[in-house]
């Protein structure tokens, strides 16, 4: 990530940051799986997969969610199964990293009683006492067959590390300062000897995690190392492998499974969990040069019509950025078709608009089309908020459109790239700072273990954080890659390619193309999940109950990179059949919200599907063309895919 300086922007907090249970010196961890534990009047449950965790009046409680499936939802809420009371009055987060968070439990005077470490990908929860104390348990643990365990919520939990400290009929732990206790739930279908193996590995509880990634032509690699304190390097602990991580190496699995809201998870031992995802190539131009003359003529006429009908762009960061990206796509078509009378003024207009947004002092002079630096929450925020962007919601969606437009328009214009860089680099750092620092957290929105981003800034929800439009997240990283290329930053481009490919894999694994035969989600009645939370997945959106919205929000904005959504043609058709108002063959069926986006998605099922969609697109009602799209781009997409 290039050096950035937030102080070049006006300093302003557009909305107050909620109460934060955070030690001084830590950058506020917005957009994290654990943000609800940090922000707000009271700590909310969080979901360090596969566990669920909540702070309680005297300490904490945790459990393994019992996944329940309905027609509309896959539910895995926080239900306390094991509780630990140490007389705590409050909690405060003292550290966080790639996949772990550590919180101190404090007494009424603010003194530390002990610390809990929560780790994504680990079923082991560890508590370390900071004083001599007795921890009261809500269930009685006892030794059976060489293991100390208890039944809770229909599940057996194993206690590791402090079995000899049990007292009070197994409901108390007498801990000395520095003593640790760890618990894990026994997996389903654990073979003989597996629980003993897991207990031995759980004796090496995780103290922190680190991230490494690699980018190759055909795949990207994500590797999370689970550090175990003073243990020798490489000591294995218990890890959990989710469906998107199946192409993994370095883990010993076959130790049982857990049902999670994301599907069946494999229980393994490893010191590093590494997996690959198919590489997705960044793309900023839909290549129409190979189209026939008739198609080019039709397209040229439509480009002229759309260019002449452009209206002033909105001034907020979502719709304003989306309009810039839309017009960048129109510019790319006009230039390929040799329409200089359209392309030259449109390029000038886009360059001027981008320069206006990128004026560092813009918000000192106007109330729109500019950015400020919020020094309290450490974020760059658009002066005209939308969808809660002043509360850190959806920044990657919004800023991805700006980065995309800048990457396209400045691709062959170094002077423009240089003018935009001070502010565009800040937008990039806000959502994707690689290392983190005093100004921004590392990878603010992206969860490396989950393989996808989180959209809510403060996550004030009992079901954890969430993300709806996984496709806009993918598009954001595509935009980041294009901007990195245009600004000559090879390191940032490599990081963006990793983010792009990883998010695309998880988007398919949990939003659009998940395994419908996975027994963990048996009974779910839909082909997509349009809202993925820490503790559930829903066939629902924030804005509409229309079936077309459920799929449309998972495919827009259908940028040139959207080919990652292709795969099984029958799955694409099944997803569409659920979303449309009638048979795919009937043009009226596409007269729905996001009808244009669904037509473009249909083209990914094959050339015949694209040709059929093209016929319908020509007469699709104008109000069904999304505000981030034009009929020109819609037709061009379908023409290109029909000719493939």
Regions found by a protein language model. Give the residues of each.
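Short sequence/structural elements of tandem HEAT/ARM alpha-solenoid repeats
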Residues: 344-348, 418-423, 494
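Aromatic-rich carbohydrate-recognition surfaces in CAZymes
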Residues: 314-334, 389-428, 469-477
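Active-site lining segments of carbohydrate-active enzymes
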Residues: 354-390, 404, 408-415, 423-464
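Ser/Thr/Asn(+Pro)-rich, low-complexity disordered segments
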Residues: 1-384, 388-389, 394, 434, ...
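A compositional/structural signature marking long, glycine- and acidic/polar-rich segments
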Residues: 425-532
